[in-house]
From Swiss-Prot:
The modification N6-succinyllysine is found at K201. Keywords: Acetylation, Oxidoreductase. The gene is Cryzl2. One of its GO terms (molecular function) is oxidoreductase activity. This is Quinone oxidoreductase-like protein 2.
Amino acid sequence: MAARLCTRCLPPVWLCRQAWQGQGRHYRAALCTELKQPLTIQEVAPRPVGPQEVRVDVHFCGVNFADILACRGQYQEKPPLPFTPGMEFSGAVLETGTDVSTVKKGDRVIGVSSFHAMAEQCITDQKTLWRIPENVSLQDAAVLPVSYGTAILAVDHRARIQPGETVLVTAAAGATGLAVIDVATNVFRAKVIAATGSDEKCKLAVQRGAQFSVNYSQGSLRDAVKKLAGSGGVNVAIDMVGGDVFLESLRSLAWEGRIVVLGFAGGNIASVPSNLLLLKNISAMGLYWGRYQHQDFAVFSKSMSTAMQYCQQGLIHPHTGAVFKLEKINDAFLHVMQRKSTGKVLLSLK
C-alpha cells in the first residue's frame, strides 16, 4: 500500500463532478482516461474470450484504495490509459473459452482481475475464478477476495495465530481490519484488541467481534494496550497504519511476539528498531497478498477457497460498509479517500 492520499490536494473537479454516462450499444464500464481526473462511464465494445478465459456478468465490484492510486498514477502497477479499474468482483458466467473446464455458463463466481472489474462485464482467466456456494450471496462473496484473502494469509500463513493468543489489529474498522478481526476471533479463537482512530470505529470493531478497542488518536497506543493485555504484551500485531502506530505496536509485543505489516495507511513508513527484535526475540514480517498470485499461486488460491469455505460454514461474516451504483464511482472514490468508509465499499452493477 502506498502513502495516504490527502483530499485537500485533490483537483476541485473531483469534488463536484459526476461520472458521465456515455451512449452506445454494448456494456458500461468505468474508464480512467486521464490521471487525477474523474472517471467516466462509457459504452465498451465486448471482445472475444480467449481459450482459457471466461466472460462474467458482474454484479458487485470491490472498491479498493489501490484502484484510486492507480487512477492517480501512484500505484506500483501502472496500466496504460485508458483503463478500467477494479480488482475483485462477483457475478455469473456468461461465456467460456474453448479450453475452460473449471466453470460453466450460469455459475455464480467471485474473481480477481488486474484492473478490469468496474464494468458490467469482465473477462478473466479461468484460474482466477472461484464458484460461490448456494448459501453465500453475491454481495457477501464480493467482500471476500482482497480483504479476507489478506486476512487469512496474515492470521494463518504468516502470523500462525494460536487459540487464546492476544492479537492487536490497527486500522481495525477498515475492510481488511474487520476481516482480520472476523477470522482471528471466529476461526482461530484469538482475543483481539482493535485499534482505530475514532470512538465510532472502535464501537464498530467491538460489534464485529473484537474483545477490546483503543482509540489511538487520544493517547499512547502502547499504554492502552498494556492496560488491556498486561505487562507481557500481545502475542501478535497486525498493522496497516505504519509510522508511529507501527512502532507502538512493535513495542506492545510480548516475548517471541510476531508483527505483520499489511500497509501504510497513515502515510509514513517507519524504520524497524532491530534491537527490539533481538531483545524480545520478535519476528517482523510483511504480507502483500496480491504478490502471491504470481509468486505462489497455490497459496493465493487456497486463501480464496478457504475464505469461501469459512463463509459457507457460517464461521465468518463479511461486512459491507457502503454500496454505490456504477455511475456514482467518483462518489465511491471520495468516500474512501475522505476516510468515511468502514468495512468494504462495493459498486453495484445491477
